[in-house]
Amino acid sequence: MKDKIKKLYGKLRKVQQEVNYEGDFQTWDEAKKRCEGYDSDAIFQKVTNAAMQVKEGKALFDRDSVLFYEEEWNYPLIAWFQRIAAKYDQRLTILDLGGAFGSTYFQNRAFLKNSIRQMQWIIREQEHFVEFGKQNLADPELIFEYDFEKIAEA
């Protein structure tokens, strides 16, 4: 499994090196200052508030800060996870790129815990999301990491 993650890491680094920008800006930082995205403070505050409500048991899961109070299993995803786990002695490691604060993990974990013996859900996100997740949401199954090399070692 570690070899597969290292191979994926290599491919992602290559794609990252090929990323460029166009426009009337001299630098990436100059362009970034003129736009707002998912890393804005307002969005971060909203999604962290929702994530903490899930952690505190006030909601079952959230999706982009929208709270859900009833179970909504993602059956196609669960079926694939179970199929993969069946090949690996009911053990499953998931690398969730852009997984926010584990919304898909929280949505499906109760179902998966009944059928998968050992699960590790690794979320790779923006650095400030990872830091918040490590400090407030991580547990033995749910891991937050920014560095692909550390992910490959997990």
Predicted segments, located by residue:
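Membrane-proximal basic amphipathic "stem/tether" segments
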Residues: M1-G37
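Generic alpha-helical secondary structure signal
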Residues: D3, Y75, E127-E131
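Charged/polar, solvent-exposed surface patches and flexible loops
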Residues: K7, E30, N49, A79, ...
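Class I SAM-dependent methyltransferase Rossmann-like catalytic core
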Residues: R34-Q90
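Class I SAM-dependent methyltransferase SAM/SAH-binding core
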Residues: D96-I151
